[in-house]
A protein has these predicted regions:
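Alpha-helical transmembrane segments and their membrane-interface boundaries
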Residues: 1-78, 82-86, 90-99, 129-175
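Internal alpha-helical transmembrane segments of multi-pass membrane proteins
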Residues: 91-117
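Membrane-helix interface "capping/anchor" motifs
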Residues: 63-72, 109-119
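Membrane-helix boundary connector in multi-pass membrane proteins
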Residues: 114-115, 120-137
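Active-site beta-strand/loop microenvironment that shapes enzyme catalytic pockets
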Residues: 82-83, 111, 123-124
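Alpha-helical structural signal
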Residues: 53-54, 105, 121
Length: 175
């Protein structure tokens, strides 16, 4: 294989955890998405959103990541939804609203330090679907809270994992 192409096919993810932990992560993802799906069926609201699958990968497969912390997940989705609603009012064209929305969501999440990459899909989702307004805000924020809740319970079960990450405490006891 040519040297220049080798970097594209080399795995850069560090080996971590046991097979049991990986199986628990997969089960957690299935339960998390299942809970959101059950909420959708029960409430007749479109809670089962594609970006939540990507959130589940982070929440259950990489819970130590800053991108998987509750403030990032819930805050990122909240900011993304508010930006999306504003952009859809200002730009009637779906592709323009999606493009401007994604750009603004990236910038605002970065500025606020609540980056959650799956939330970047919300402007595209809203620009290409019939989910709008209060329904969009409710299902996105409600679904993200549900996923974080399931992840919190999931990581409490053995083999346990500290989630959410705790802020380090300094020697004098101050955070």
């Amino acid at each position: 294989m040519p040297h220049r192409l080798r970097h594209f096919v080399t795995r850069h993810e560090v080996r971590s955890g046991s097979t049991l932990q990986h199986m628990k992560s997969g089960l957690g993802g299935a339960i998390g998405i299942g809970a959101v799906g059950a909420l959708a069926v029960t409430t007749h609201q479109p809670f089962l959103l594609a970006p939540f699958g990507a959130s589940a990968v982070l929440l259950f497969g990489h819970p130590a990541s800053p991108l998987a912390q509750p403030a990032n997940v819930i805050g990122g989705y909240f900011v993304a939804t508010l930006v999306t609603l504003l952009v859809l009012m200002l730009f009637p064209g779906a592709w323009v609203a999606a493009a401007v929305g994604v750009g603004l969501v990236i910038a605002l999440m970065s500025i606020l330090r609540i980056t959650h990459p799956p939330a970047g899909a919300i402007p595209i989702l809203a620009a290409t679907s019939t989910i709008q307004g209060g329904t969009l805000l409710g299902v996105v924020v409600g679904g993200s809270i549900g996923l974080v809740g399931v992840a919190s319970l999931h990581h409490w079960l053995p083999p346990r994992f500290e989630y959410p990450k705790r802020r380090p405490v300094k020697e004098n006891g101050a955070p």
